[in-house]
Amino acid sequence: AEWGGGWGGHSNPDYGRIVTLGTDHLREIISENSKKYPDEAWFYRSCSNILDALDIFGKRYGEEALKQAENCDNTEDKELLVRMAKAFEAVPKKPAYDFTSAICSFMLIFALDGSDSPGRFDQYMYPAYLKTENKGEVKELLGRLWEYFHDHRSWNLCISGSDENWNDESNELTYLILDMVKKTGYNTPNLTCRIHKN
């Protein structure tokens, strides 16, 4: 699902579905819905085509990451490229298994869709954050992501908020993002913090 106009920067793709479910699971949903709604078969075919493109894009990114890792002299960069190549063996077809793989899935959609709003980043990335043993990797990746956002205009990133019963949905990732914004001083992406009565 996507909200917004047909111009860059004013839409919010549902990154969370790809990050948490993967394209294989989304294909199952598409298949079920195309049987339920045969008059909309053209729409579901186009959805499948987009998922195919995303998978091809991911495969190419994985190959490129491995190629760059082989020629990289910087130890830190080489380790990241190897982690990315490993991640792209799974994502976007499968759900993200840690923060590196979640960032890889996110970036595929972000690049393919044309640098739109990251949306409620701390919410859909949090499950992957919890699966990541080395939280230092999360900070490193957030730092690199914020540099990317700064160099390639992105629009609105939303944090915090509540559920339908006013339970606070802030989490550790919410505060890491706030720290990153404070540390970098960048105004891209625009940061929206949802405040609620509790």
Language-model regions: role of each:
Residues 45-56:
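Extended non-globular scaffold/tether segments
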Residues 55-62, 122:
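Hydrophobic faces of stable alpha-helices that mediate helix-helix packing
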Residues 65-81:
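Short, Lys/Glu-rich amphipathic helical modules
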Residues 1-47, 76, 80-88, 94-198:
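Conserved catalytic cores of very large enzyme subunits
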Residues 61-66, 126:
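Extended amphipathic alpha-helical scaffold segments
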